[in-house]
């Protein structure tokens, strides 16, 4: 990674922009594999991937926007793919804040996205994909998400897909004294199990690839619950009245044949890719619902949270401007640091020349005399650059990068790696939306 402040480019595919098939096609085999693919692209300095059951998002930091888009496409995140939305620097940053606040979730204000963001950040950090640009962006996003939930009512009521799935099932069948099966013992499965318990189902079977996690979830609920394996769960469907699936499996975990004798059963598949194989809904009495069918439940939640959402929107804009200011200050500081480095190199040469001349005329200088010469040179550099430093910071705050470019030409700093912004455009590379 270089010392320059780069540009964020992003691409997203979500429940709002794509069909479930398009979402499945955009999903990577794993977050780690996606990060590796992005970081293998030559221009990529940083990378971040967020992949949940209803969204796939990838972000990279590169020297310019065009390089970022090419890198995303080269790693399999095609900005022109089905349902994909390409994002420039500011759009990417604002979108991350909206995601963390829960405004982009299927269930507005849901809490699980914060944990998913933290996990994605940790994965990116472990892969070597996080430096100061994405660190500041994701940290700011999580800060906004926490503020939104503590300072507004954005997460009141049904606050997860797991809860929404149970609400949908409740509209389709009687849950009191029903027999429920939850497939997947992750956070979403646990929330679905708790929601079933609150709906006073008679019993819950919790299935997971690793039974120990299923046991932990079974111990959390207030109704009779049994933990089992995924393989065993297929034989429990005949007795089930309602099934919610939420695994992270890349393949179907419940074949259509498992529902052949299930009879009247409501199935809500929250997974992406789907847990339930196509054709399951063709059996008599079996009704399979997916993420698209949650709209009726989530729309009601969205309406109840409209006032809170407006408060969060205002909060996001304030924090977004603060984030941009952080980046602008960072870019200005990079230019200023290089200017001082250039001045220090010049100062060192001139001090050495002056000392040699003085010693040639008067003999060796004492340590105190040498210190006087060096202190005078330091003071001159500091005083001469104080006003330009303030002007450069003011110019950065106003996005006046042409002024900074002019100042650089006047001071002629000896940049070895180029400018940390695109001076040829007369503007900040981070806000430039260059075309391929």
Swiss-Prot record:
UniProt site (Important for activity): 95
* EC class name: oxidoreductase
What are the coiled-coil residue ranges? none
Q: Note on file?
A: During catalysis, the active site Cys acts as a nucleophile attacking the alpha-carbonyl group of tRNA-bound glutamate with the formation of a thioester intermediate between enzyme and glutamate, and the concomitant release of tRNA(Glu). The thioester intermediate is finally reduced by direct hydride transfer from NADPH, to form the product GSA.
What EC number(s) would the UniProt record show?
A: 1.2.1.70
Q: Which reaction does it catalyse?
A: (S)-4-amino-5-oxopentanoate + tRNA(Glu) + NADP(+) = L-glutamyl-tRNA(Glu) + NADPH + H(+)
Q: What is known of its domains?
A: Possesses an unusual extended V-shaped dimeric structure with each monomer consisting of three distinct domains arranged along a curved 'spinal' alpha-helix. The N-terminal catalytic domain specifically recognizes the glutamate moiety of the substrate. The second domain is the NADPH-binding domain, and the third C-terminal domain is responsible for dimerization.
Subunit structure of this chain's protein: Homodimer.
Question: Would you tell me the protein name for this molecule?
Answer: Glutamyl-tRNA reductase
NCBIfam families with a match to the protein in the record:
hemA
Point out the gene that encodes the protein.
hemA
Give one Pfam family, short name only. Answer: GlutR_N
Pathway field of the UniProt record reads: Porphyrin-containing compound metabolism; protoporphyrin-IX biosynthesis; 5-aminolevulinate from L-glutamyl-tRNA(Glu): step 1/2
Q: Which PROSITE patterns match?
A: GLUTR
């Amino acid at each position: 990674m270089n010392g320059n402040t780069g540009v964020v480019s992003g691409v997203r595919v979500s429940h709002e922009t794509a069909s479930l098939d398009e979402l499945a096609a955009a999903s990577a085999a794993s977050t780690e594999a996606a990060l590796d693919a992005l970081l293998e692209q030559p221009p990529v300095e940083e990378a971040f991937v967020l992949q949940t059951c209803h969204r796939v998002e990838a972000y990279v930091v590169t020297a310019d926007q065009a390089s970022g888009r090419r890198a995303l496409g080269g790693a399999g995140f095609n900005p022109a793919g089905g349902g994909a939305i390409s994002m420039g620097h500011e759009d990417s940053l604002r979108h991350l804040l909206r995601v963390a606040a829960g405004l982009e979730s299927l269930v507005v204000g849901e809490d699980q996205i914060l944990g998913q963001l933290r996990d994605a950040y940790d994965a990116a950090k472990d892969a070597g994909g996080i430096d100061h640009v994405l660190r500041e962006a994701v940290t700011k996003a999580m800060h906004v998400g926490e503020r939104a939930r503590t300072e507004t009512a954005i997460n009141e009521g049904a606050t997860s897909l797991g809860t929404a799935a149970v609400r949908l099932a409740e509209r389709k069948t009687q849950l009191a004294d029903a027999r429920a099966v939850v497939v997947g013992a992750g956070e979403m499965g646990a929330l679905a199990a708790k929601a079933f318990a609150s709906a006073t189902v008679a019993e819950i079977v919790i299935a997971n690839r690793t039974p120990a996690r299923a046991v932990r979830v079974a111990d959390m609920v207030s109704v009779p619950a049994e933990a089992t394996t995924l393989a065993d769960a297929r034989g429990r469907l005949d007795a089930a009245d309602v099934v919610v699936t939420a695994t992270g499996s890349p393949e179907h975990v419940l074949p259509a044949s498992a529902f052949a004798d299930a009879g009247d059963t409501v199935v809500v598949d929250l997974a992406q890719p789907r847990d339930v194989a196509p054709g399951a809904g063709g059996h008599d009495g079996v009704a399979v619902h997916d993420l698209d069918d949650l709209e009726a439940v989530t729309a009601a939640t969205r309406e109840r949270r409209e006032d809170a959402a407006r408060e969060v929107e205002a909060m996001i804009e304030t924090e977004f401007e603060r984030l941009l200011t952080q980046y602008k200050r960072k870019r200005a500081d990079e230019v200023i640091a290089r200017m001082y480095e250039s001045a220090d190199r010049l100062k060192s040469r001139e001090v050495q020349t002056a000392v040699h001349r003085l010693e040639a005329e008067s003999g060796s200088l004492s340590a105190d005399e040498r210190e006087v010469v060096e202190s005078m040179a330091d003071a001159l550099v500091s005083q001469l650059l104080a006003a330009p430093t303030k002007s450069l910071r003011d110019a950065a705050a106003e996005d006046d990068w042409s002024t900074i470019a002019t100042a650089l030409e006047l001071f002629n700093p000896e940049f070895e790696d180029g400018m940390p912004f695109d001076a040829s455009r007369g503007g900040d590379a981070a806000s430039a939306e260059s075309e391929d």
